[in-house]
């Protein structure tokens, strides 16, 4: 199941990318460079066309689309302005659904304090969606070799 088939995503923004512009999606520069992930979220939320954003790092390509759909479903039934994914007791603040009207609160965090994502979440409130899939789906992958290696270590070939 592809991401576009599983999720009603109509607006994709890239943050934190400093390489050659070779993607069809807009790259949103941080308004306050050097403020980490929260600075990127703040800039993207100001450009977003929708009241909610699904936040997902490019270095976690194995997260199943079905898990993201479940995360979105929980966020739709939540009063929290941020619903982040949790797996095996590990909370992932860069895998979540955020209300874009949090941009002003993010601005305050990055200009008046350190700009830590968890400090922001603790101050503004959040809830967790507890994933039901194995932890390895959330592996941080930054190179093609690791991308090929991780699934191979966890899938059993049916026809050997």
Protein language model regions, located:
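Nucleotide and nucleotide-moiety/phosphate-recognizing core
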Residues: 1-114, 119-138, 144-157
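Cytosolic-facing loops and C-terminal tails of multi-pass membrane proteins
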Residues: 160
